[in-house]
């Protein structure tokens, strides 16, 4: 089998295939399964300091026949609850947080 290991920004990945933020990173069980079935890294859903409810539905709109866009409003439980709910240290692959903030100061 080919060796697909890569190093990026000082992180070692068993392969360059990463699970992007989206539907498949919405529960701890799914993240664990993705790590076990070959993802080189996992990128979390959006995480903010304080929880966000997201936009009320509908969150999709058809902009042309057969062409849809969505905007969820970055719903998330907030950093503390996320860390309690998602046992990231038990995963055997790098986890890249998708951090969002209302101001640059929140990133400090």
Regions found by a protein language model. Give the residues of each.
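Active-site entrance/lid segments in N-terminal catalytic domains of soluble metabolic enzymes
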Residues: 3-13, 18, 23, 28-108
């Amino acid at each position: 089998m080919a060796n697909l290991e890569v190093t990026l920004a000082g992180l070692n990945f068993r392969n360059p295939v990463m699970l992007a933020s989206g539907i498949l990173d919405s529960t701890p069980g799914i993240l664990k399964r993705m790590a076990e079935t070959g993802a080189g890294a996992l990128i979390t859903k959006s995480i903010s300091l304080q929880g966000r409810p997201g936009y009320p539905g509908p969150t999709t709109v058809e902009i042309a026949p057969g062409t849809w866009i969505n905007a969820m409003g970055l719903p998330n439980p907030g950093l503390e609850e996320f860390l309690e709910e998602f046992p990231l240290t038990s995963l055997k692959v790098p986890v890249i947080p998708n951090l969002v903030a209302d101001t640059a100061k929140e990133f400090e």
